[in-house]
C-alpha cells in the first residue's frame, strides 16, 4: 500500500483560532512512527512504489504552500532522520512580493471569528445570495474539521465568490487588521531554499495563486510550472491540487496539467492507495487524520 500524508503549518507558535500548526516535536514523533511502519519515499520513487504497491508498504510525506517554517523546521527534521520529503509550492508571492489571498484569509481568521467575518462579507452586494446556495455536502467534505459557520465562510471565499471579488474583500480586511506588518519574505521559502530542495528532488507544483483548478483558470497551473521549471534542474512532474477535494478538481484541469508535463497529481481524498491507482488523483490524508481517521490509525498502529 501507499499512504500520503499532507501538512501545512509547523511551529511552536500558538494561535487562539484560525491556524493550528503541528509542533516540531509532533512532526518528529510522526516521522519516527511512520519510518518504523513504512518505507518513506521521495517523489522520484513514487513510480516504483506504485508499481509494487501490492507487495510493500510506502509513505510519502508532503507539505503544501512552501512556507518558510517548512524549510526551517520540517526539512531539517527530515534531514536529521535521513528521510526524503516533498514540498508543493505556489509562485505568485514571488511575483507580487506579498502574501497569497489564502494566507491573508488564514491570518484574518486568527483574530476574527466566523460571525465577525460573515457580518463583514454580508455587507458586500451579492454575497448573501451566494450563501443561500451553498451545498452543505460540499462544505463538510472540504472542511470536515471546521465548525459549520467557518466552513461556510471558507467555502464562500475559496470557491463561490469571483476571484477578483474575493481578493478585494480579503485584501481590504487584511490591510485594516495587519497593515504592512507581515512580509512575504518572512512567510515563504526563499528562491534559494526552493532551488536547494529542487536539487534533492523535493519540489512539486501547487498552483500560481492557490486557486482551485476547477475554476477553469488553467493559466494558474502554467504560470506555476513555468516558474518552477526555471529554478529546478529537472522538469516538474508532480502537482498538488489546491484544496484537493473533488469539487476543487476538474477533468479539464487534469488534461491541462498533463499537457504541462505533470505525471503525478495529489488530491485530498482521504484514503490509502492500493491497486488501480489514478496517477492524477493520488489519495492523500491530512495530518489531522493521524488522530481522527480510524482507518489510518489502525493501519499505522496495528498494521491492519
Question: Each predicted region: which residue ranges?
Answer:
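Generic enzyme active-site microenvironment
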Residues: 62-63, 204
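Short active-site segment of divalent metal-dependent hydrolases/proteases
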Residues: 67-68, 209
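Short, flexible loop segments at the rims of nucleotide/cofactor-binding pockets, characterized by
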Residues: 19, 63-65, 180-185
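Metal-dependent polysaccharide deacetylase catalytic core of the NodB/CE4 family, i.e.
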Residues: 5, 10-11, 81-247, 282
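C-terminal active-site subregion of NodB/CE4 polysaccharide deacetylases
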Residues: 1-62, 69, 100, 106, ...
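Membrane-embedded segments
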Residues: 70-74
Amino acid at each position: 500500500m501507499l499512504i500520503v500524508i499532507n501538512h501545512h503549518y509547523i511551529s511552536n507558535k500558538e494561535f487562539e483560532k484560525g491556524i493550528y500548526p503541528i509542533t516540531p516535536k509532533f512532526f518528529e514523533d510522526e516521522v519516527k512512527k511512520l519510518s518504523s511502519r513504512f518505507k518513506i519515499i521521495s517523489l522520484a520513487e513514487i513510480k516504483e512504489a506504485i508499481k509494487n504497491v501490492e507487495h510493500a508498504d510506502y509513505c510519502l510525506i508532503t507539505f503544501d504552500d512552501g512556507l518558510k517554517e517548512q524549510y526551517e523546521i520540517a526539512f531539517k527534521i527530515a534531514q536529521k532522520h535521513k528521510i526524503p520529503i516533498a514540498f508543493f509550492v505556489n509562485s505568485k508571492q514571488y511575483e507580487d512580493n506579498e502574501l497569497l489571498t489564502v494566507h491573508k484569509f488564514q491570518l484574518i481568521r486568527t483574530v476574527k471569528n466566523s460571525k465577525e467575518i460573515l457580518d463583514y462579507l454580508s455587507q458586500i452586494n451579492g454575497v448573501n445570495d451566494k450563501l443561500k446556495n451553498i451545498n452543505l455536502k460540499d462544505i463538510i467534505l472540504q472542511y470536515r474539521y471546521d465548525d459549520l459557520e467557518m466552513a461556510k465562510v471558507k467555502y464562500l471565499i475559496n470557491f463561490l465568490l469571483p476571484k477578483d471579488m474575493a481578493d478585494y474583500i480579503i485584501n481590504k480586511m487584511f490591510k485594516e487588521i495587519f497593515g504592512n506588518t507581515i512580509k512575504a519574505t518572512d512567510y515563504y521559502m526563499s528562491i534559494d531554499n526552493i532551488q536547494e530542495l529542487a536539487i534533492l528532488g523535493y519540489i512539486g507544483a501547487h498552483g500560481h495563486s492557490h486557486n482551485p483548478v476547477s475554476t477553469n483558470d488553467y493559466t494558474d497551473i502554467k504560470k506555476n510550472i513555468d516558474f518552477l521549471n526555471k529554478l529546478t534542474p529537472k522538469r516538474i512532474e508532480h502537482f498538488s491540487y489546491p484544496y484537493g477535494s473533488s469539487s476543487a478538481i476538474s477533468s479539464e484541469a487534469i488534461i491541462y496539467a498533463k499537457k504541462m508535463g505533470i505525471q503525478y497529481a495529489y488530491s485530498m481524498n482521504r484514503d490509502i492507495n492500493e491497486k488501480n491507482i489514478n496517477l492524477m488523483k493520488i489519495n492523500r490524508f491530512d495530518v489531522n487524520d493521524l488522530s481522527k481517521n480510524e482507518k489510518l490509525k489502525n493501519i499505522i498502529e496495528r498494521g491492519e
